[in-house]
């Protein structure tokens, strides 16, 4: 009887260990499961305009001004953050706040899959309320992580929006983000970039002309030469 009981307990012990191992493997697999991101290759953008589609882009300054500055950008691009901090700040002070020019932001999410999610989130906020876009843009650049890290994930974006844009309809934003309601707009921006032979970010145009020197002085010279 003792041997029989010992055998039963031994089998039960093995079963418990195996169940534990399976649970650990299952939980580990769930924890390491990669987050899914929008796939622009599968998106039909419809008709793509010949120009920059300015009337549908977020802008700063005076849209009636004769000077139109367009930037193609990726939220994960370190050079884009630097350009925003050093050049856009000066352009805003010199031209945009004075009503002498308009600045348009166009998405070119090419660095990583979460670049596309970041662009989609910005577009989704813009469609809910145009005033929500620029706080999002500023905060995403200020809190930019390492280019090779998938920091622009849904959790990061939802927290950033919840903590910093108090008037947003958060449930609507999350639903539209999950359903990728405005992904065609992001794809359209990407195709506009391709049409203008944009091969990196930041790329800047002044009145339709690609500016090679995108320092403040270079852009000022391009404006002065119009």
What is each PLM-predicted segment?
Residues 1-39, 72, 160-226:
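C-terminal cap of thioredoxin/glutaredoxin-like
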Residues 73-76, 81-162, 196-199:
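Structural alpha/beta surface segment adjacent to cysteine/selenocysteine redox centers
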Residues 57, 106-109, 145, 174-177, ...:
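Conserved short-loop catalytic and cofactor-binding motifs
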Residues 67-68:
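Alpha/beta-hydrolase fold active-site loops
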Residues 44, 56, 63-64, 112, ...:
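Solvent-exposed, flexible loop/coil residues
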Residues 26-63, 93:
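N-terminal, intrinsically disordered, polar/charged segments of Gram-positive cell-envelope systems
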Residues 62, 71, 85, 213:
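Conserved strand-loop elements at the edges of beta-sheets that form or border functional pockets
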Residues 54-58, 88-90, 190-192:
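A generic local structural motif
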């Amino acid at each position: 009887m003792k041997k029989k009981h010992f055998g039963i307990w031994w089998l039960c012990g093995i079963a418990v260990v195996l169940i534990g191992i399976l649970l650990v493997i299952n939980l580990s697999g769930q924890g390491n499961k990669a987050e899914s991101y929008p796939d622009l290759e599968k998106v039909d953008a419809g008709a793509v305009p010949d120009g920059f589609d300015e009337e549908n882009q977020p802008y700063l300054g005076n849209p009636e001004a004769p000077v139109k500055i367009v930037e193609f950008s990726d939220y994960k691009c370190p050079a884009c953050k630097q350009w925003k901090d050093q050049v856009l700040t000066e352009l805003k002070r010199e031209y945009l706040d004075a009503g002498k020019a308009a600045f348009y932001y166009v998405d070119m999410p090419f660095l990583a899959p979460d670049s596309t999610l970041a662009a989609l989130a910005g577009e989704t906020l813009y469609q809910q309320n145009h005033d929500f876009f620029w706080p999002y843009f500023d905060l995403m650049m200020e809190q930019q992580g390492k280019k090779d890290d998938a920091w622009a994930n849904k959790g990061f974006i939802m927290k950033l929006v919840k903590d910093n844009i108090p008037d947003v309809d958060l449930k609507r934003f999350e639903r539209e983000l999950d359903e990728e309601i405005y992904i065609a707009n992001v794809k359209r921006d990407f195709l506009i970039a391709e049409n203008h032979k944009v091969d990196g970010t930041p790329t800047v145009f002044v009145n339709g002309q690609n500016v090679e020197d995108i320092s403040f002085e270079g852009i000022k010279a391009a404006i002065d030469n119009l």
